[in-house]
């Protein structure tokens, strides 16, 4: 079975720690985005097989399985499942890949996927950063950041910085859309 993305939504971007969303709980704005998405689709919420949400720092207000919480806060039936996955900066893309794999395997037909992160409400590296001492000394690359990851991928696949920037510009022009208006 083929997988297709039928719709998408996003929140406005705002400045971390000082922007319009800095005082809004991430579960609140995530559920508002899901409500708008569901209002624009002609599907029965009971048909949703799972809500799969990526989150790099699933703790604090975006912990406790925020994928499930945003499903409940959005008015989905209490039987609706939800899961939160973590692949750091690639978490939301991983959510999409998991849904696609589930569809291909015949384990469902309708999934809501996304990503949620509040850099204002949960600080970078989380609340209690405590790397394993062995990795700190023997393999610090275990905690590589997104910038280094991008450089590694670019080198591995032969993608220049200019090509990356051009691709980013094209995507931003294609995907310009009105963000979901949030109650703050």
Language model region names:
Residues 55-109, 140-148:
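Conserved catalytic cysteine-centered active-site region
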Residues 42, 52, 92, 107, ...:
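Conserved functional loop/turn residues at catalytic and ligand-binding sites
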Residues 104-157:
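Flexible glycine-/small-residue-enriched beta->alpha junction loops
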Residues 174-184:
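Single conserved hydrophobic/aromatic residue that forms the stacking wall/gate
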Residues 1-56, 60-62, 66-70, 74, ...:
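Conserved active-site "lid/cap" helical segment
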